Curated annotation (Swiss-Prot):
One of its GO terms (biological process) is succinate metabolic process. Keywords: Chaperone, Cytoplasm. The gene is sdhE. It is found in: Cytoplasm. One of its GO terms (cellular component) is cytoplasm. Signal peptide: none annotated. This is FAD assembly factor SdhE. The lineage of its organism: Bacteria, Pseudomonadati, Pseudomonadota, Gammaproteobacteria, Alteromonadales. Belongs to the SdhE FAD assembly factor family. Pfam families: Sdh5. An FAD assembly protein, which accelerates covalent attachment of the cofactor into other proteins. Plays an essential role in the assembly of succinate dehydrogenase (SDH, respiratory complex II), an enzyme complex that is a component of both the tricarboxylic acid cycle and the electron transport chain, and which couples the oxidation of succinate to fumarate with the reduction of ubiquinone (coenzyme Q) to ubiquinol. Required for flavinylation (covalent attachment of FAD) of the flavoprotein subunit SdhA of SDH and other flavinylated proteins as well.
Length: 82
């Protein structure tokens, strides 16, 4: 998967759940540009997941079955706030 420009990433972060918006928007604004290209691709992969899955992973109700995506979930949760 190729890297998206920042405007497209911001748009992809707009979800159907406010809880996810609150996590993703600050992460993109404050952290995304500093990620390695590999992690940017991984974040984009994460954004392709369905909202109910993302919500369950970020709220700790379920563990993401993909270890790479699980690492990105931890990274977003830990660094989303400024």
């Amino acid at each position: 998967m190729e890297l998206m420009n920042i405007a497209r990433v911001r748009w992809a972060c707009r979800r159907g759940m406010l809880e996810l918006d609150v996590l993703f928007q600050p992460f993109v604004d404050n952290v995304y540009q500093d990620l390695s290209d590999e992690d940017k691709v991984l974040f984009i992969r994460l954004l392709e997941c369905e909202d109910p899955e993302l919500f369950a992973w970020f709220m700790g109700h379920e563990v993401c079955p993909d270890p790479e995506l699980a690492r990105m979930v931890v990274q977003v949760r830990g660094r989303a706030a400024p």
